[in-house]
C-alpha cells in the first residue's frame, strides 16, 4: 500500500442554523462545518413531514382528465 495518500481526520464541530451543534471527525481542515438542517430540525426526523403539492399538479391532472368514480368505465377502443 502507498504511504501518505490518505487525508488526515480532524475533530470537526457541525453548527446547524437551528442552533444545534455536535462534534464529529472530518477531513475539513478548519474544524467547523455550517449546515442548514440536521437531525434535530429536519422534518423527516422530527415527524413534522408534509407532503406538498407543488404547483397544483393534482388539480391540474383532475382538470385535464376529470375525477373518475370507482367502477366507472374509461373510454375504450371503438
Swiss-Prot record:
Keyword set, alphabetical order: Metal-binding, Ribonucleoprotein, Ribosomal protein, RNA-binding, rRNA-binding, Zinc
Gene3D superfamilies xref list: Ribosomal protein L31
Gene: rpmE
Family classification: Belongs to the bacterial ribosomal protein bL31 family. Type A subfamily.
Family annotation (SUPFAM superfamilies): L28p-like
Entry binding sites for Zn(2+): 16, 18, 38, 41
Protein name in the entry: Large ribosomal subunit protein bL31
GO biological process: translation
Cofactor: Zn(2+)
Annotated cofactor note: Binds 1 zinc ion per subunit.
Job description of the protein: Binds the 23S rRNA.
One term of GO molecular function: rRNA binding
Pfam families given in the database record: Ribosomal_L31
Subunit text: Part of the 50S ribosomal subunit.
Intrachain S-S bonds: none
GO cellular component: ribonucleoprotein complex; ribosome
Amino acid at each position: 500500500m502507498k504511504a501518505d495518500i490518505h487525508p488526515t481526520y480532524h475533530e470537526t464541530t457541525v453548527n446547524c442554523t437551528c442552533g444545534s451543534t455536535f462534534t464529529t471527525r472530518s477531513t475539513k481542515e478548519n474544524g467547523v462545518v455550517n449546515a442548514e438542517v440536521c437531525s434535530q430540525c429536519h422534518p423527516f426526523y422530527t415527524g413534522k413531514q408534509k407532503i406538498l403539492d407543488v404547483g397544483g399538479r393534482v388539480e391540474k391532472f383532475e382538470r385535464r382528465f376529470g375525477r373518475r368514480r370507482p367502477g366507472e368505465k374509461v373510454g375504450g377502443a371503438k
